[in-house]
Amino acid sequence: MASKPTLSSILGSFHRRDHEPPPVVSKLGWRYHHVGIPTDSPRPNETHLEAFGLHVSGFSTSPFGIEWMRYSDDSPLHPAIKTMPHVAFEVDDLDAALEGQEIIYSPGSPSEGVRAAMILVDGDVEVVRDYVRRGPIIDYDQAW
């Protein structure tokens, strides 16, 4: 049985120029969501997620989509998740995006209506997520 294609094999070799978006954006239609950065230092307004051995901050308040993560020594998460930054992307079909990838955190639901998984791609941690249900997009400047 043939192995399923990886992102590297789907995207092929490429050389991106300064003005071009990454190939997962231009070729696959993925959309940037946030970047997660592990830290050893306590941060303001941390939320403790006991099941993950994790203190998280910044996700809902950073204008740039930066999430800070401080892990406990006994965190059950994959070592790469605890030590490497990740970039999270929205996708239209999580199952299709995960096909053939090295999944290091199985699809789960970080919040209502969202599914997310973490994968290793060429040694880098990436998060892919989709929305089970999406509400209407509200332009808050126009709403008020």
Spans of model-derived segments:
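Vicinal oxygen chelate
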Residues: A2-F59, I66-P79, Q101-W144
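Mid-chain, well-packed structural core segment of small domains
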Residues: A80-G108
